[in-house]
């Protein structure tokens, strides 16, 4: 009887030691703050200069916008940043962003994720998180 108890306790302890490690957050898997900063900066550099979308960036302090977007993505992917910006709806209300403009920015973001080596799984997870925001950003 005592031997049986020792075996059971040993197996339970072994099972506790073999618990799978929790999966890394999307933030970690993407590459953390350095990668999110790079992707945010590159995306905004492209869309702010492209004739299809540049009008939305007239008079915008790009350094502040880049920091804000980086913090926003950090929070949305599970990082420990703090986003202090407005809601998506409030910050885009007066910009009259069209569906075509929104989709162009998503295309640029997708391309920047690819160029920077972000995996397909992580890219799709991020886009799935951001997709519902279309209704808050597009007003035309």
Write out the residue ranges for each language-model feature.
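Bacterial N-terminal signal peptides that target proteins for export
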Residues: 1-6
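C-terminal motif of bacterial Sec signal peptides marking the signal peptidase cleavage site
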Residues: 13-15
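Core of compact, soluble alpha-helical bundle domains
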Residues: 17-140
């Amino acid at each position: 009887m005592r031997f049986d108890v020792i075996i059971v306790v040993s197996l339970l302890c072994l099972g506790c030691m073999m618990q799978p490690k929790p999966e890394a957050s999307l933030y970690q898997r993407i590459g953390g703050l350095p990668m999110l900063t790079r992707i945010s900066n590159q995306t905004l550099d492209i869309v702010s200069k492209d004739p299809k979308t540049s009008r939305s960036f007239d008079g915008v302090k790009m350094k502040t916008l880049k920091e804000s977007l980086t913090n926003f993505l950090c929070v949305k992917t599970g990082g420990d940043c703090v986003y202090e910006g407005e809601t998506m709806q409030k910050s885009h209300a007066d910009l009259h962003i069209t569906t075509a403009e929104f989709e162009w920015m998503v295309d640029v973001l997708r391309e920047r994720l690819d160029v920077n080596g972000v995996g397909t799984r992580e890219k799709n997870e991020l886009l799935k998180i951001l997709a519902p925001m279309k209704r808050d950003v597009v007003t035309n």
